[in-house]
Amino acid sequence: MKYLCLVYSDEELLHSLPESPRDEECLAYAESVQESGRLIAGEALAPVQTATTVRVRTGKTTVTDGPFAETKEQLAGFYMVEARDLNEALRIAEGIPPARV
């Protein structure tokens, strides 16, 4: 079964902590999940400052800069994995480095 693990983080907090996961650690973890045959896809997303929100209401498209809502945490990336069941997917998700922050 496929599971989508969403990675949320507070960008300011993540980059201010001396022990926060760095790109190398995240890439190494993604590589280990890929080598296990469980990774279908995974990507880090661009910083929230580059976000654009697109909405369509009653046939009219509205485009605004930035995320739709002010939040403390932002969607920072994702892992799509193949797992036997939810428990295996949870074990994979708990190993994602930013999950510790």
Feature locations, PLM:
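Conserved, structured core segments of small domains
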Residues: 1-101
